[in-house]
Each structure stands twice: as structure tokens, then as C-alpha cells.
């Protein structure tokens, strides 16, 4: 019978991906809990209010009819409050964000990658804000004063098809501006290329996570350092590594990466201990030599 051998490095890389996914899910759940913190307080009971709360009512010269007015208008005030709560755009937006967070968690549990989910979510949120929170700059002071005295049905919700089309185009432009250069489009091919590059970088770093690399020290000697000593998440290390010149292209071609150069780059930017130990001038020369050697292969 033939036996199937599993590469230990593949197992370590898979465990690292699972750890990153769990940390991302925990972070999203924490953000959802923080956003819903205002819903966890104890409700205020009207029966527990002080008896002299009636003093807060405005006296319009007809104090004798205050009791009748309060009883007769009690139902109307409750109805107005319920309408305000239902029509409050900020409250509706809060519910929308809660649902978006739950949807992100469900998609990640189903196996989808976070970067793809987030790029789609950004466009949806921008479209929601553009449609439901129009720019009020065109309103005059007279319209604002009229709005405070009398309530009129909202007309912003009904828009013509041309307005909807212009709003959707604005949302797409805003999403592209927030995501990167205008020429970059969030196509499936670009996302897959970017994810494959990150996966290749993460795979090679995970394989050599505990391997010691030699660096020049300030005391004219050498010292050993590895990725474990960074005390950083693998996802954060990959993001820093993508800034090293030439690493993204090498990862796209599935070529071997200059891991000592990557480690020196990340450690020099994030580790104070490494900064105190290393000789910066010699490190720059070593990193440049490593890049030239790997790019020429």
C-alpha cells in the first residue's frame, strides 16, 4: 500500500492560518459587543421616577389644566416617541452595522477570506450612507426653521433613477479611493493574486519561524534573531514584509524569499530590542546584498 506523507511545514502553515482566523473572529465579536454595549444597561422604569417630576413641564400660564393636558397628551407623546425611534437614521444605521458584523462572522465561519469580505462590505456601507444620509448643504436657513416647527414626510427616501445611478457611481468612486489608486479595480483576479501573494509569504515565513538568522551587532560582533522573538502576529509580519522592495514580485512568482532581509526589515521597524542590538549601516548593506542575490536568481 502507498503511504501519503504530510509535510510538517504545511501543517504549521495551516495552524497559523487557523490562528489568524480565530483572532480575527474574536476581534469582530468584540467590536460587535462594544457597539451593543448601550443595549446591555438596565432599563429605566417610569414608576420609579420621583413624584415631583411634573415640575419639569413648562408652565404656559394654565397650570390648572396641567393635569388634564398631561393625561390627554400622554398617548400622543408616546406615539411621537415611537415614531422618532423608528425614523431615527442613526438608530437604523446602528442596527445595519450590527447586522453587517453578524454577516461578516457567518461568512468567515463558512470559509471565505476576510479581505474579500471586507472589500465588499466597505462598498455596501458607503452605498448605504450615500443613500440614507444625503448632503444637507443645499438646505436654506428658512427650510431649517420650518423643519423645527412642523414635521413633514421625508422626501429623501424617494429618488429618481438618475439620482440613484449617480449615487451608486459616487459610492463606487469612494470605495476605490479608500481601497487604493483609482486605476486599481477590486476584481476577483486582483483579489486572488493579492491573497496568493500573502499566502506564499506567510507560508515561507511560517516554515522558518524559529530559524535563527545572524545579524551584525553594535559591539562589532554578531547576534542571532528569529521571527518568534518579534512577538508579532503572522498576519502583521506579512503586511510589513510586503513593503520590502521586490518581495511581492518574488512571492507572486513563488520564488524563494530573502527571509533574513525580511526579518531585519520587520524587526527594525517594530522591535526596540533589535534596534538597540543591530548595527544599522551594516544591516542595510546585508539586506541590500540579500535582495540583489535573490532577485538575480
Curated annotation (Swiss-Prot):
Q: Which residues are modified to Phosphoserine?
A: 63-64, 162, 210, 271
Locate the compositionally biased regions of type Basic and acidic residues.
Answer: 71-80, 140-157
Question: What does this protein do, in the record's words?
Answer: Non catalytic polymerase cofactor and regulatory protein that plays a role in viral transcription and replication. Stabilizes the RNA polymerase L to the N-RNA template and binds the soluble protein N, preventing it from encapsidating non-genomic RNA. Also inhibits host IFN-alpha and IFN-beta signaling by binding and retaining phosphorylated STAT1 in the cytoplasm or by inhibiting the DNA binding of STAT1 in the nucleus. Might be involved, through interaction with host dynein, in intracellular microtubule-dependent virus transport of incoming virus from the synapse toward the cell body.
* Sequence similarity: Belongs to the lyssavirus protein P family.
Q: Which residues form a coiled coil?
A: none
Single GO term (MF):
RNA-directed RNA polymerase activity
Q: What is this protein called?
A: Phosphoprotein
PTM info: Phosphorylated by host PKC and by an unknown kinase.
